């Protein structure tokens, strides 16, 4: 918001660069550090053909950088019908045609998993260690 009165394209180029730098910081961390980015999502499609992606500032980051492409694992949090009138909160593990999500083949058997980050980290560690 500090640059809200600034006109021109440069501020968006700066924001895009800063955003990309932030996402790439994970590559410089120790292997034992677990870094989880969370974000809001936005519908870049329409009401009939929705396409939910990571929300960004402006089109530069989403169209030129594609933030999801900088990650090996992308989970999409969803509320899905549970028992009766109850909703269950789950993570989508791979794209379903409307939501962006991705994990390596064979990491998760189910499309929806429990909303449990500790369990996800455990599964990722086991997968990467070849267990």
Ranges and model annotations:
Residues 1-65:
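P-loop NTPase motor core
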Residues 43-131:
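Conserved GTP-binding G-domain of TRAFAC-class P-loop NTPases and closely related GTPase folds
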């Amino acid at each position: 918001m500090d640059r809200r009165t600034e006109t021109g394209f440069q501020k968006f180029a700066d924001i895009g660069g800063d955003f990309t730098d932030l996402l790439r910081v994970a590559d410089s961390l120790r292997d034992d550090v677990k870094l989880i980015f969370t974000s809001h999502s936005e519908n870049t499609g329409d009401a009939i053909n929705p396409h939910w992606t990571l929300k960004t500032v402006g089109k530069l980051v989403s169209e030129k950088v594609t933030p999801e492409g900088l990650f090996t694992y992308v989970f999409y949090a969803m509320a899905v019908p549970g028992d009766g009138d109850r909703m269950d909160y789950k993570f989508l593990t791979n794209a379903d045609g409307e939501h962006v999500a991705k994990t390596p083949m064979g990491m998760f058997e189910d499309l929806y998993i429990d909303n449990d980050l500790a369990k996800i980290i455990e599964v990722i560690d086991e997968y990467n260690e070849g267990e």
